[in-house]
Design a protein with these regions (language model features):
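Intrinsically disordered, low-complexity acidic/polar segments
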Residues: 73, 132, 164, 324-326
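C-terminal cap/substrate-recognition subdomain and adjoining C-terminal extension
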Residues: 2-20, 228-409
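Alpha-helical substrate-recognition element adjacent to the catalytic core
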Residues: 6-43, 47, 53-56, 96, ...
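Intrinsically disordered, serine/threonine/proline
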Residues: 1-158, 352-409
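Short helix-terminating capping/connector loops at secondary-structure junctions
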Residues: 132-135, 160-161, 215-220, 282-284, ...
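Short, well-ordered amphipathic alpha-helices
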Residues: 125, 206-210, 301-304
């Protein structure tokens, strides 16, 4: 029997009515805002958010967004809760610019693109016969059609130096998000920044080891998928850099309101869609899929195992609450049973060390990396959970009378 999580749903007619109402309101608000901005000169493009792209010897796939607001810049060491809250507001109050003509260049080839209604651009650049750089990353460039706002766009090179690829979730897979504790999750999202958010211990060393492969010299690409909105892209990219997690293309979700992507629609199916696209785009590679038990990753990755078979090397589902048996564990274990007949190993794991030990047995990483991962995981086991740490921090501020930096760490 197919495992199903317990979930309450709104009646279909109520959901449809709410969607239509909010979509209509959103369209009117967007239209009014753009008329106001055009009247007072506030709709001019000021920033091209060029997301990390990926490609191979034949070309590259690139995406990004044109905004009428300047970039926020990285987090500062002295940012307090108010700075973080204000920056979060600025991220979600995005002033996208539709209908902007762009010129994108890569390996000497130039193409034109135009932003859509939400300010996004997407382009495929074919570069047959053009030399491919030996580096793991190569830069494309994107600019307005008149040449202004010239912006570099990093392109991950998937070349002969890769044995396999990694597709990983983000929340509670590499980044502590406490997605099951809404109070802590809200505090982390709104009152923290890329510098104060915490990685899962051992994740950075594990992902670097997977990228380097069994011999320690490979260039295996790492991709990230998440149900978080594109508005958080800069925070996630900064977070990876600050915590030495291998950078890679990040595929997020547009929370714009239309029938295809209504903000309140449940589900994480776009993760599977992105995984399918990557697997098809790079047919030479086999894949390692990493997720967590807090969302639907087990179900989605099980579908990938059934669909792609031997092209999936392994599936690892992090237990968001290891040591405690709960319905989520049974849900994940049910999908593991479903996958058992595919010959794809699928495991529910407690931490990065469990992933590393199994991956070592498959010949996916070098044994020398285990000691570093084990040491980081051991430190994490002695640390309080995020809800416990948040409660302790709040108590300390009450005792000391220091409430000027709530949420900071």
């Amino acid at each position: 029997m197919t495992p199903t999580p317990s979930r309450r749903r709104w009646p279909a007619h109520v959901t449809k009515y709410l969607q239509e109402f909010v979509i209509d309101a959103d369209e009117h608000l967007d239209s009014a805002r753009r008329r106001y901005a055009a009247r007072f000169g506030g709709d001019a493009p000021k920033h091209i958010a060029a997301y990390r792209a990926h490609g191979d010897a034949g070309g590259a796939d690139l995406s990004g967004r044109v905004l009428a607001s300047a970039p926020l810049g990285g987090p500062k060491e002295d940012d307090g809760w108010w700075d973080n809250l204000l920056n979060t507001y600025r991220r979600f109050e995005s002033d996208e610019v539709p209908g902007v003509a762009l010129e994108i260049a890569f390996r000497g080839v130039r193409v034109r693109a135009t932003t859509d209604a939400e300010g996004y651009y997407h382009a495929r650049i074919d570069t047959p016969g053009a030399p491919m750089s030996d580096a793991l990353w190569e830069n494309a460039s994107v600019a307005l059609a008149d040449g202004t706002l010239l912006t570099p766009q990093p392109v991950l090179q998937v070349g002969d130096g890769a044995d396999f690829g990694v597709i990983s979730d983000i929340d509670d897979t590499i980044l502590h998000s406490s997605i099951l504790d809404w109070k802590t999750a809200a505090q982390l999202t709104f009152l923290h920044n890329a510098r104060t958010r915490k990685p899962l211990r051992g994740a950075a060393t594990l992902y670097r080891a997977l990228q380097a492969g069994a011999g320690g010299t490979r260039r295996n690409p790492v991709f990230y998928v998440s149900s978080s909105p594109w508005n958080l892209y800069d925070l996630l990219d900064d977070f990876m850099e600050l915590n030495a997690i291998p950078p890679g293309p990040v595929f997020l979700r547009d929370i714009g309101m239309d029938p295809g992507k209504f903000v309140k629609t449940a589900g994480h199916g776009h993760k599977l869609d992105r995984a399918r696209e990557l697997i098809a785009r790079h047919p030479r590679l086999r894949w390692v899929l990493v997720g967590d038990s807090g969302q639907a990753d087990a179900e989605l990755y099980a579908a990938a195992a059934r669909e792609f078979g031997e092209r999936i090397l392994a599936i690892y589902i992090r237990d968001v609450d290891p040591g405690t048996e709960d319905p989520r564990d049974a849900f994940v274990d049910g999908w593991i049973e479903q996958v058992a007949g595919t010959a794809v190993p699928m495991l529910r794991v407690a931490d990065s060390l469990a992933i590393a030990e199994h991956a070592l047995g498959l010949g996916l990483l070098d044994a020398a990396s285990l000691d570093g991962i084990a040491a980081e995981v051991q430190r994490a086991r002695a640390r309080p959970t995020l809800p416990e740490a948040a409660a302790d921090e709040a108590k300390e501020k009450v005792v000391t009378g220091d409430v000027s930096q709530p949420g900071a760490s």
